[in-house]
Amino acid sequence: MKYCINYSNKSHIINKVDEILIRYDKNKILELFTQFIPAHLNQRVIIQLIEENNIDTIVNNLKKIISIYNENKDIKFDIQLPFYNQKFMEELKDTNLKYFFKVAANSWDKFTGLISQNVSDIYITDELAFELDKVAEIAHKNNIKVRIYPNVAQSRWDKLSDILKFFIRPEDIEMYEPYVDVCEFYGDKAQQIDTYYKIYQEDKKWFGDLQEIIIGLDSKIDSRYIIPRFAEKRIKCGKDCLKNGKCEMCKRILDLSEQLENAHLIVQIDKEKEEDKNA
């Protein structure tokens, strides 16, 4: 799993991450191609054309980028566009540039539609993120990277119980590695993003209330008392709890966590014994 952040000159981890998203600035285009990209040859640089709401402005900026690329194809970068538009596709069709959209797939319809546009990456959100086994299989067959935001509680219905929304605890991030290619943190402050990177990529644990790190959680969920098996089924459950009501795993785990918290008990798995058992 690779990690991606938005560029900020205030970030202390800009040279650590695998991917950098940098917003296109027409006033700094020379600096972008002659200084920034050459300084990050070992990282994937993704130029974002997402600031302008005007389609024609985005097309003109895209033309400038493609023109520079055609003059020097040794420059390595990819492009992120705000959404699908046929005018964008017309400009890109005769290039070898890789591109994807800021818009996410939260349904099979959107997922299939994005695949049809030959994108390099797709963001997966909401209930579709509960079928990551199937999503990843199809995406990888099409040479498409699966991207997720782990630090946001995601649902198309914001009144849904928090425990039924998609999010990833730092303790569970390794379980998602077979299915997720890129982990990108949601936020706009460099210090905040640097902290997320440390928590998820380095520490892989959070001793406390998930409200403090998961955007959109409205209820207290103490990560210390969530049992280690929490993510194992959520990766591929398809949200059966909402389809037939037979699965209540998440709710039961939440109830159990409250009991464990009251008893001051923390459940842990011995990873060495677990590896020996699965060997």
Region locations from a protein language model:
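Active-site pocket-lining/capping segments in soluble small-molecule metabolic enzymes
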Residues: 1-113, 117-279
